[in-house]
Curated annotation (Swiss-Prot):
InterPro entries: PsdUridine_synth_cat_dom_sf (IPR020103), PsdUridine_synth_TruA (IPR001406), PsdUridine_synth_TruA_a/b_dom (IPR020097), PsdUridine_synth_TruA_C (IPR020095), TruA/RsuA/RluB/E/F_N (IPR020094). This is tRNA pseudouridine synthase A. It catalyses: uridine(38/39/40) in tRNA = pseudouridine(38/39/40) in tRNA. The keyword Cell membrane does not apply. SUPFAM superfamilies: Pseudouridine synthase. Keywords: Isomerase, tRNA processing. Belongs to the tRNA pseudouridine synthase TruA family.
């Protein structure tokens, strides 16, 4: 029997998603809790492996088990066995052919910036603090040149192991609400550090250090050395993973916190 779970977590104290020796990971904590509930060792697969310090409200995992448990055992039971910064949002039995990563058709991330002179004490690990003056409208304008299918080598980490740098970005919106700036981006898949590298480059435009047209120029150059720095991990959230509708997986509010599902000026997508 194959089970899919929707997971959210605060990644602040974890060394990323993937299980590693001698450091804590989100995968390790979930597998330990699942193994207790199932009464056998459990190995999980996820939709997207997040880096150290990165959060998720819409991570999806799957695992195989022959343990016959009610839905409440997987949700309430798991949440009582997980640390406070990891939680299950939903559970669904799926076909054996379902795969959390390979069945997905798109991923969506949000990057949350706290743009204020002084750092925040509340939610400090859930946002990235930038004190410089930032124009979110300029960031949004520049980001539109990234829409469509492109070679994103410029925004790819050196250690990225993907076979191809080509990705299809279907939505990118940058908006401001008071001191908070949110970059909302959706694509069929993402390269390692792609969202954080895009954010770091758009921030240079928002700070007036580069013109709007610069983003299109560095994208075409396919050279990581020409782009901006990698933005900090703390503001990044995996908020949604798309799957074919016939799978019937639950749809939950994206978040984080108060953020609406639709970006300003759009309908849901």
């Amino acid at each position: 029997m194959r089970i899919a779970l929707g997971i959210e977590y605060d990644g602040s104290r974890y060394f990323g998603w993937q299980r590693q020796r001698e450091v804590i990971s989100v995968q390790e904590e979930l597998e330990k809790a699942l193994s207790r509930i199932a009464n056998h060792p459990v190995s999980i697969q996820c939709a997207g492996r997040t880096d150290a310090g990165v959060h998720a409200t819409g991570q999806v995992i799957h695992f195989d088990t022959d343990a016959n448990r009610a839905e409440g055992a997987w949700t309430l039971g798991l949440n009582s066995n997980l640390p406070p910064d990891i939680a299950v949002r939903w559970v669904k039995q799926v076909d054996e052919g379902f795969h959390a990563r390979f069945s997905a058709t798109a991923r969506r991330y949000r990057y949350v910036i706290y743009n204020h002179n002084y750092r925040p004490a509340i939610l400090g690990s859930g946002v990235s603090h930038y004190h410089e003056t930032i124009d979110a409208d300029l960031m949004h304008q520049a980001g539109q040149s990234l829409l469509g299918e492109h070679d994103f080598s410029t925004f790819r980490a050196v250690a990225c192991q993907s076979n191809t740098p080509w990705r299809n970005v279907t939505h990118l919106c940058v908006s401001r609400s008071g001191p908070y700036i949110v970059l909302d981006i959706k694509a069929n898949a993402f390269l390692h550090h792609m969202v954080r590298n895009i954010t770091g480059s758009l921030l240079l435009v928002g700070q007036g250090l580069q013109p709007v047209e610069w983003i299109a120029e560095v994208l075409a150059a396919r050279d990581r050395n020409l782009a901006g720095p990698t933005a900090k991990a703390g503001g990044l959230y995996l908020v949604d993973v798309d799957y074919p509708a016939e799978l019937g997986l639950p749809q939950m509010p994206l978040g984080p916190l108060w953020l609406p599902d639709s970006a300003p000026g759009t309908t849901s997508f």
